[in-house]
Structure formats: structure tokens, C-alpha cells
């Protein structure tokens, strides 16, 4: 398509579309991992991440997305699709949803590539983060395990909606206008999941042949394999590592820098692995799928949320006698204790919470009951205007005890006040204005009396003004 873009704007636009497609795949797949993702923001962004979002990339997902794109970009007539499906342990599968990134011919030639397109793609990616967690597949992904797993497949071409069955619904995430076309991101998802309980899943032909090593050339190059989002069989070895994110993607080196910070790298067995809640593992499987996440099914479990019944700061591992496959992740959930810090007391009483830093005090807890700082002595009862206003004359003797229980009177002693300076004492001023007197203007009798007095004195005031009328005229002449 012929446009008026210069070479630099065209290069930036292609780069934005490329990395938006890669980040779209990351967001969709990470939303189907079955775990909550928590990322930390940073006040010092760099150019290693994109679209003002700290999305930690899974290297294998990025690798598969680049293989599916094969150097192409979503354009008019070329769509990138991410298919999410479900597969049981018996081999039955069912498509759940299909995410489509496409472009139409409607152009916006007035928009600026370097700022407007980039910021709108960032907003579209944030919308995708929210919408991926409201479709039915998200709830299924949170319950995946030994009975079924969630798979993903990336392909480039026409959208295939036949596997969604009848009555599927579509939702449009959003659109972004560019000088070469309008980018559209949409989703079609299955809503009829009632037949899942009867295990009557739709049979689909194998997408690829059975491969022992998935790095060998596939017998069907035109097909794309399915990848479990969050599953690993027992006894698998993670001997093959994917290229790291830093090696597989470029740095945002445009004329501006509004990208989130770079990822922290932790040395692993065979190279740097990005530290994050979605740690991938790469392994070969005996059927047509390959593995893409970190959660093993041999009992190893990583606590994801503090609301779980287990301790949210430790990693529970049921396998004994061997190292955990995600030892790197333990640094995220284990509380780090600094040097020269005593172990906190497990049982902390309520009285110890009244004093700041009570757990570091050298005294014993049993002496706190006699401490006047913890349990101050009872102050004598005092009478104040506020207390008198609270106990009205109409209150009966039976309700006076209940009122005293509800209102606790405290003798107000302001700081830095002196008793000998009564007119300037802040406490006296405060007590006087707690119960201010009624305004005289609000009383009808007093108002009527004052008005009558004013009317009686009116003739005298008029006579005084008539007597001094010459003085008033002379004063007016001096003003002229």
C-alpha cells in the first residue's frame, strides 16, 4: 500500500507492530497459565521492554511466535491467530477460544507514528490484559491439572472458527488506526461448556506427528503444534533451553523512551533466565505437544497468592531427596532476613502492639501488665461542658449508666499550655466553645424587644440629625 511515510516512520511502525504481536501472544498465553501474575513497577524505565508494561516474556512462547510469523507482519489479508484449547488426560480435545490480530484497509494518515500509535498500542495491550481474564477459558485454566490441560497454538493466516461449535460469541478488544491500516484485536470464544462433564469432547486430528525431539524438522512443516500452557509430566528433564529474551528481541531504540524497565536476569543451568512468576521450562514430550511452563505435576507447588491456606512466603515441595525444578523461583516467595536481625516472636500479644517496636524491647512479655505505658492507671472522673451537654435533663436514671458506657470522657490537657495564663489557654478556649451559647438573633422575644426599642428611639435620632443638618451640609460642600 502506497503511503506518505518516510523510511524512519515506516521502520518504527513495522517494529511497533512486530513487538505488539509478540506481546499479544505473551499476554494471552500467560493468562492461561493457571497462576496469578504479580509484577513490580519501576520508576526508572529502560528500552528493553515495550508499551509501558512490565511483561516478563516466556522465551519459548516468544520463540514459537517468531516461528509462526516467519518474518511477516499482520497486514491486510494476513492475520495472526492464537488458539486456546483444552485437552484431557484421555486425549480428547476441544477448542475454547481464538484470538485474532488483523488489519483492514482503513488508514489514518494524520496520526503520528512515534507517539500516538505507540501510546494507543499500549492502551490496547492493557485492554487485552483485562479481557483475557473475563472469558470462560480463564476459569478453566485456573483449575487445570492432571485431568486436563490448556493448550495454545499460534498460526498465521485465515481465522478458523469451525472448532468453536455453535453459538460462540465474539468480542472486539479494540482498534488502533495507523497510516497503513487499522489494527484490530478480537476474540471468539465458546460459551457451550455443558457437555464437558460427560467427556464428549470433539475429536480433532493430530496437528503434527509424534516427535521425540521437537527441535528436529517436523514432518508437516505447514502445521503448528499445540503447547500446554501449564502442565508437565513427572520425571521430565529440562535439558534443552530456549534462547533468552534479551537475545531474541531488539531493544526499543526509537527517538523516545517510554518503555518499562528491563528484566532481572538470574544465572541458570544453561544461561540467563528472566526472573518472574512465569518461568518456562523446555522439554520433549512423547506425543504431538511440547511444554511451555514451569509448574510440575509431581507434587511441586508454588504458592501464588497470600489468600491460600498455605504459607504465601514459602515454596512447598512434596518431592524429597532431590532438587526442585524451579529453585530459582524460591527467591520470589521466601522472605529475606537481614544480617543481625533476631527471629521475630511467633506469638505476639495484643498488649505488645500498643508500644512501637515492642518486639525489640529487652524486657519480658509478662512484665508488660505492670508497665504504666501499656496499662495506664485510671484517671479520676472530671466534669466538663461536653459531658454536661451529653447528659440531658430528660435522661432517666436507668439510661445514665448506658450513656456513660458509650461516652468516655477524657480530661483535655493540651500540650505546651500553662494554667496561670487562663485567657490565652488553649484548653479553656476549647472547653468554652464546645458548648457555645445560643445566638440572640435566634430568639424571637429578644428580637421583637430590640426592634421595639429601635422604633421608640427613632424620633430622638431624627431630631438629633435635624439639629445638626447645617454641619452635615457643610461637610458635603467640602467634599465637592
Curated annotation (Swiss-Prot):
Gene3D superfamilies: HORMA domain. Residues 305-321 have a biased composition (Polar residues). The LIR motif (LC3-interacting region) is required for the interaction with the ATG8 family proteins GABARAP, GABARAPL, GABARAPL2, and MAP1LC3A. It is found in: Cytoplasm, Cytosol; Preautophagosomal structure. The modification Phosphoserine is found at residues 318-319, 324. InterPro entries: ATG13 (IPR040182), HORMA_dom_sf (IPR036570). A motif (LIR) lies at residues 407-410. It comes from Bos taurus. Phosphorylated by ULK1, ULK2 and mTOR. Phosphorylation status depends on nutrient-rich conditions; dephosphorylated during starvation or following treatment with rapamycin. ULK1-mediated phosphorylation of ATG13 at Ser-318 is required for efficient clearance of depolarized mitochondria. Residues 127-134 are annotated as: Important for interaction with ATG101. It comes from the Eukaryota. Keywords: Acetylation, Autophagy, Cytoplasm, Phosphoprotein. This is Autophagy-related protein 13. Residues 254-323, 368-403 are annotated as: Disordered. One of its GO terms (molecular function) is protein kinase regulator activity. The modification N-acetylmethionine is found at residue 1. One of its GO terms (cellular component) is cytosol. Part of a complex consisting of ATG13, ULK1 and RB1CC1. Interacts with ATG101. Interacts with ULK1 (via C-terminus). Interacts with ULK2 (via C-terminus). Interacts (via the LIR motif) with GABARAP, GABARAPL, GABARAPL2. Interacts (via the LIR motif) with MAP1LC3A, MAP1LC3B and MAP1LC3C. Interacts with TAB2 and TAB3. Interacts with C9orf72. Autophagy factor required for autophagosome formation and mitophagy. Target of the TOR kinase signaling pathway that regulates autophagy through the control of the phosphorylation status of ATG13 and ULK1, and the regulation of the ATG13-ULK1-RB1CC1 complex. Through its regulation of ULK1 activity, plays a role in the regulation of the kinase activity of mTORC1 and cell proliferation. One of its GO terms (biological process) is protein localization to phagophore assembly site. Belongs to the ATG13 family. Metazoan subfamily.
Amino acid at each position: 500500500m502506497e503511503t506518505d511515510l518516510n523510511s524512519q516512520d515506516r521502520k518504527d511502525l513495522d517494529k511497533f507492530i512486530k513487538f505488539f504481536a509478540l506481546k499479544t501472544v505473551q499476554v494471552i498465553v500467560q493468562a492461561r497459565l493457571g497462576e496469578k501474575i504479580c509484577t513490580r513497577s519501576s520508576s526508572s524505565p529502560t528500552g528493553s521492554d515495550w508499551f509501558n508494561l512490565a511483561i516478563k516474556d516466556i522465551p519459548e512462547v516468544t520463540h514459537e511466535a517468531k516461528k509462526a510469523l516467519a518474518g511477516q507482519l499482520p497486514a491486510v489479508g494476513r492475520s495472526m491467530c492464537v488458539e486456546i484449547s483444552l485437552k484431557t488426560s484421555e486425549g480428547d480435545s476441544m477448542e475454547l477460544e481464538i484470538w485474532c490480530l488483523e488489519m483492514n484497509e482503513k488508514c489514518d494518515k494524520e496520526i503520528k507514528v512515534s507517539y500516538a500509535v505507540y501510546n494507543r498500542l499500549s492502551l490496547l495491550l492493557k485492554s487485552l490484559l483485562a479481557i483475557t481474564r473475563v472469558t470462560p477459558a480463564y476459569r478453566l485454566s485456573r483449575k487445570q491439572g492432571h485431568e486436563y490441560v490448556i493448550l495454545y497454538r499460534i498460526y498465521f493466516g485465515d481465522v478458523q472458527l469451525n472448532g468453536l461449535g455453535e453459538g460462540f460469541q465474539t468480542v472486539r478488544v479494540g482498534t488502533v488506526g495507523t497510516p497503513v491500516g487499522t489494527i484490530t484485536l478480537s476474540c471468539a470464544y465458546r460459551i457451550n461448556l455443558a457437555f464437558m462433564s460427560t467427556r464428549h469432547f470433539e475429536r480433532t486430528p493430530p496437528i503434527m506427528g509424534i516427535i521425540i525431539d521437537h527441535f528436529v524438522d517436523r514432518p508437516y512443516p505447514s502445521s503448528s503444534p499445540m503447547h500446554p500452557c501449564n502442565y508437565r509430566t513427572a520425571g521430565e528433564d529440562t535439558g534443552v533451553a530456549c534462547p533468552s529474551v534479551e537475545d531474541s528481541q531488539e531493544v526499543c531504540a526509537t527517538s523516545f523512551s517510554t518503555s518499562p524497565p528491563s528484566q532481572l536476569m538470574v544465572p541458570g543451568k544453561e544461561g540467563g533466565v528472566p526472573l518472574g512468576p512465569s518461568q518456562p521450562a523446555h522439554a520433549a514430550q512423547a506425543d504431538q505437544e511440547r511444554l511451555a511452563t514451569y509448574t510440575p505435576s509431581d507434587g511441586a507447588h508454588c504458592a501464588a497468592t497470600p489468600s491460600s491456606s498455605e504459607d504465601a512466603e514459602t515454596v512447598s515441595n512434596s518431592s524429597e531427596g532431590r532438587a526442585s525444578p524451579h529453585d530459582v523461583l524460591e527467591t520470589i516467595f521466601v522472605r529475606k532476613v537481614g544480617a543481625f536481625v533476631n527471629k521475630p516472636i511467633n506469638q505476639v500479644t495484643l498488649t505488645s502492639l500498643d508500644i512501637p517496636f515492642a518486639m525489640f524491647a529487652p524486657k519480658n512479655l509478662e512484665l508488660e501488665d505492670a508497665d504504666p505505658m501499656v496499662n495506664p492507671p485510671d484517671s479520676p472522673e472530671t466534669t466538663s461542658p461536653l459531658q454536661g451537654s451529653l447528659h440531658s435533663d430528660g435522661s432517666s436514671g436507668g439510661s445514665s449508666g448506658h450513656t456513660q458506657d458509650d461516652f468516655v470522657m477524657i480530661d483535655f490537657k493540651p500540650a505546651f499550655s500553662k494554667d496561670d495564663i487562663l485567657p490565652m489557654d488553649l484548653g479553656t478556649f476549647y472547653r468554652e466553645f464546645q458548648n457555645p451559647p445560643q445566638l440572640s438573633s435566634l430568639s424571637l422575644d429578644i428580637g421583637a424587644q430590640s426592634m421595639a426599642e429601635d422604633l421608640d428611639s427613632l424620633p430622638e435620632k431624627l431630631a438629633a440629625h435635624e439639629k445638626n443638618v447645617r454641619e452635615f451640609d457643610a461637610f458635603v460642600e467640602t467634599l465637592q
